[in-house]
Design a protein with these regions (language model features):
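Bacterial Sec-dependent N-terminal signal peptides
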Residues: 1-22
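Exposed aromatic-hydrophobic patches
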Residues: 45, 97-105, 221, 333
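Extracellular carbohydrate recognition and processing domains
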Residues: 58-60, 74-108, 119
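Hydrophobic core segments of beta-strands in well-ordered, beta-rich domains
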Residues: 57-58, 114-115, 159-183, 204-208, ...
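Short carbohydrate-recognition loop motifs
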Residues: 25-36, 515
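Conserved Ser/Thr-centered positions that define the repeating blades of beta-propeller domains
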Residues: 196, 258-259, 308-311, 371
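Beta-rich accessory regions
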Residues: 32, 41-58, 64-77, 113-116, ...
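Surface loop/turn signatures of beta-propeller and other carbohydrate-active proteins
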Residues: 34-38, 81-95, 124-162, 181-185, ...
């Protein structure tokens, strides 16, 4: 371990000069939000040559790292801010809540200036550089961490970004603030990055995109580059991934590529490729359209909804059509209609028409089917609700999925994990399909087959039993045990069946076909399902999150639910026969 001051001595002996920490603070430093930081916050600088992989940052967990007292860490060179993040260092006599290994491998062999805008003049002396990434072995063992849903080891996550598959690995990126631990921190946006060989066991890779200057790295997607383009993936075997994302310095849509199979990423020198065109441009969805040999971008631009753009080189873009009322995080992919056999496209995202527009749904997960010729999307259906949430948002499908499946992961927005060193998690990977229900093509969500490999021992196996038998058998289920529950039931005519999972209640009426979901007595969603025979349902019960799938995914839910909440782990009420009930424990994806 090398303290920075020790490193200073070593480099001075080699002939390198260092700037000394100033005695006075700067008069009007600004945080990323533009809010002046308090006068007592000082700028402490030290120029070093980076010869290690990580700077070890001893940090305190904060509710909001940009409020007064926040500290700003910067890496500067050549008069530019190359990196920054807001945080709070542990004081001289304070025990840090956690150590964050801040990755500086990008700057190895380079002389940079470390700048700390801090109220603690001695902070530099307590920082260490080394080549070891410190990882708390107990970080994945917290009582509220999900056992089979992905969550970051440390810090905040939100939108899923840029999911793709290549060379045996599934990649997911996500909006991340890795230094705020379990606080709610939707700022200082990085792109976190994790990989998996099987869609269920995940390993964190280095941060893919860091904010620089007063920049933010907001949401986006991955496109597979198909042909040589000057400045993009030169010397890399094609097709190769290109990240498309929103950045704020300068504001616009930016690109990044990887020289080493996705482990590290470099911003394109010609950014931004799409300057600001609306009042809130963000979240580019970019894909290759084979029929027209062109790239297509769908971009949220504020009041005008989604805008479609077209390019042949990922750099020069032409606007082709608009879809009003859509909001944030667009997704777009082809699927075959089960009713007509026609190849259609699915436009997916948040649909948010103004209240004065009558007859329109409003949904944080919505879809519309239509035809697409490479320039114009022509709807053939109305906009419909898709996933019913309420904790499901900003979802993307995997590009280049090896089995040709549309597989989607979303952010389970609003989930709670008290006391943990992280905040928020991802949904299970869900296979999408179009199925015919009630004469129309319906977008359905179901866990991918790979999730079944996480099943442990069977805990309950019942055939042709009553609800009372289920309640009796399930009394012994431990609340902290993650579960996979599948059931098939046949309600009597014009009956109401209730299924209780912790504090959640699903109520199905055979008379109306209506399915409602309530959380601790408050209704949070209602829909209709159209079973042809027994009613099938599946419940994936994890710590902090429950996902439910009815009638082959016709209705899908993702709901925040602590295992310490009141209510039985699983129970059924009503006049019905449970034809089959299988309950398995679920293995911990974080076990070595």
């Amino acid at each position: 371990m090398k303290h920075l001051l020790t490193l200073t001595t070593l480099l001075l002996a080699a002939g390198h000069a260092f700037a000394q920490p100033p005695d006075s603070g700067l008069a009007n430093l600004e945080g990323a939000s533009g809010t002046p930081l308090p006068m007592q916050v000082k700028a402490i600088t030290q120029t070093v040559r980076i010869e290690s992989d990580f700077i070890q940052l001893p940090l305190l967990q904060r509710a909001d790292a940009r409020k007064p007292g926040a500290e700003r860490f910067e890496i500067r060179a050549d008069g530019k801010v190359l990196r920054y993040v807001h945080l709070q260092f542990a004081g001289k006599d304070q025990k840090p809540d956690f150590i964050y290994s801040y990755d500086v491998r990008e700057f190895r062999g380079r002389e940079v200036t470390l700048c700390f805008k801090s109220s603690d003049a001695g902070v530099l002396a307590r920082l260490e550089l080394n080549n070891k990434e410190i990882s708390d072995p107990q970080a994945y063992e917290g009582p509220h961490r999900p056992r089979f849903h992905f969550s970051p080891r440390l810090g905040w996550m939100n939108d899923i970004n840029g999911s793709y598959y290549q060379n045996g690995l599934y990649h997911i990126f996500y909006q991340a603030n890795p230094t705020c631990a379990g606080a709610s921190c939707g700022f200082d946006m990085h792109w976190g990055h994790s990989v998996s060989k099987d869609l269920v066991h995940w390993k964190e890779w280095p941060i893919a995109l860091f904010p620089n200057a007063y920049d933010q790295c907001y949401s986006g997607s991955t496109v597979m580059q198909q042909q040589p383009i000057t400045g993009l993936n030169e010397g890399v075997m094609l097709p190769a991934p290109v990240l498309a994302f929103t950045a704020t310095g300068p504001h616009g849509q930016h690109l990044a590529t990887s020289p080493d199979g996705g482990r590290t990423w470099q911003r394109f020198a010609g950014n931004p490729v799409v300057p600001r065109i609306g009042d809130a441009d963000r979240d580019p969805k970019v894909f290759w359209h084979e029929a027209t040999k062109s790239y297509v971008m769908i971009l949220y631009v504020g009041g005008k909804g989604y805008v479609f753009l077209r390019s042949t080189d990922l750099q020069k873009w032409k606007r082709t059509c608009e879809r009003p009322y859509w909001y944030e995080c667009p997704e777009f992919f082809p699927m075959k209609s089960p009713t007509t056999g026609e190849d259609l496209w699915v436009l997916y995202g948040n649909y948010n028409p103004p209240k004065e527009v009558p007859g329109k749904i409003r949904a944080s997960s919505a879809y519309q089917l239509g035809r697409f010729d490479g320039t114009t999307f022509t709807p053939v259906t109305e906009v419909r609700r898709a996933h019913l949430g309420p904790n499901f948002y900003a979802a993307l499908t995997f590009v280049n999925e090896p089995k040709g499946r549309p597989v989607m992961m979303g952010w389970t927005r609003g989930t709670r994990f008290p006391g943990e060193p992280f905040n928020q998690c991802a949904s299970l990977p869900l296979q999408l399909s179009l199925k015919a229900f009630n004469g129309q093509d319906t977008l359905c969500f179901e866990p991918v087959q790979e999730v079944n490999a996480l099943r442990g021992r069977p805990l309950v196996q019942l055939v042709n039993v009553s609800p009372a038998s289920v309640i009796e058998k399930c009394k012994t289920l431990e609340k902290e045990t993650p579960l996979d529950v599948t059931l098939s039931l046949r309600p009597n005519e014009k009956q109401i069946v209730k299924i209780v999972v912790r504090g959640l209640q699903f109520t199905y009426s055979t008379a109306t076909g209506k399915l409602t979901c309530s959380n601790n007595g408050r209704q949070i969603s209602e829909t209709e399902i159209h079973p042809d025979g027994p009613v099938a349902a599946r419940f994936m019960i994890d710590r902090g999150i429950v996902e439910a799938f009815w009638n082959g995914g016709e209705a899908a839910f993702s709901i925040s639910s602590l295992h310490t909440d009141n209510g039985p782990t699983f129970a059924i009420e009503g006049n019905t026969t449970i034809e089959d009930l299988q309950i398995f424990s679920m293995n911990n994806i974080w076990d070595k």
